Amino acid sequence: MSKVLTKAAINPLGFLVTNAGVLSLVQDAGRFGAFNLGLTNGGPADSLAFYWANSLCGNALNATVIEISLGGLQLIAQVDCIIAVTGAPMPLTVNGRAKTLWQSFLVKAGDSVCLGFASVGVRCYLAVAGGFVIKASFGSTATVCRESVGGLKGAKIAVNEVLPCHVVSRGGYLRKHLMLPESRQPHYANEVLLHTVLSYQQQHFSAIEKRLFFANDYQVSKHWDRMGYRLQGRAIKADINGILSEGICYGAVQIPADGQPIVLLNDRQTIGGYPKIGAVISSDCAKLSQLRQGDSVHFEAISMSQADNLFHLNLSRLKQAQLIHL
C-alpha cells in the first residue's frame, strides 16, 4: 500500500460526517505507558476486527480507524481513497448500493458511505488506506471520552467534522483489492465463553463461591460500555467488601458488594478497590465487547499455561489466514 500513497497526497480533506451514528470514535491500537498520569489504554474494543480492517487496507497495525458502535454512521468522501469495514454485520452502502464487509474497495470523492445498524454484535471498524490522519495525544490517537483525550477533540465523532485521510494515487485505482475469506471471518453470537485466569485475590472467595461462579451463566445488564460490562446472575460473595485501590488489568473481573461481576475493558479506570476473582483473556474480551444487554456469558477457569497456549493458538490462526486478491 505504501506504493499507492505519497507524502503529497496528505491533506486536511477526508470524510465529512453527515450522521455520527450512535457512537463513533477515532481509535488506534491504544495508549500505553501513561497509567502514571491516570490515563487508561483506550483502543479498539474488538482488537481482531481492528486488525483485519487495517490489514485489508495494507496499513500498519497501529493505524488510526473509526470504531462504530451499533451503527448509523454516514460520511461523504472528499477524496479518492481505499476503505474496508470489518466487525459486527452492519449494512454498508456506497451511493445506495450494497457493499461487502471484510474486503477493501475504492471510494471516490463525492461518494456517500452509509452504515446501517447491526443485527447482531455491536462494533465495526472503518479503515482507510494509510490510516486517518489524526494528531496523537500522549502517544496515541485513541479516544477515551471519560478522560477527554484522543480523537479530534477528546470526544466522540460529531456531525460536520472532517476526518482527514490520505488520497489514493492514480496507481491505486489499478491495485487489486483484498478480501478475508468467509471461513476466516469471526462469528458473532449472543453468547460467549470467557476463559478466566484466577487472581491472587481468589483467596477471598470460598471454594463454593468459586464453583458457583464458574457453574452459572450470566447476562449482560443494561450497564455495558467501553469501560466495562456489568453482568447479572447468581451473586458471588467475597469475605471482604473492598481492598486498597490498586492497578487494574484489561479483563479484570471485579466483584463489588452486590456480588454481580464486572468485566473491565479498554476504557477502565486505572485503579480500583473491589476484589477481583480473576481476569478474562484478551481474545475473549474482544468477543465480550460485541455483546449487548440480555446476551449471555459463561466463565471457564484456566491456568496461566493454558492461557498462554490459547494466545499462541490464536496467533497461529491469525498468521495462517490469507487475504484473497480480488
Task: Give the label of every model feature segment.
Residues M1-L326:
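Conserved "landmark" site that anchors the functional core of diverse proteins
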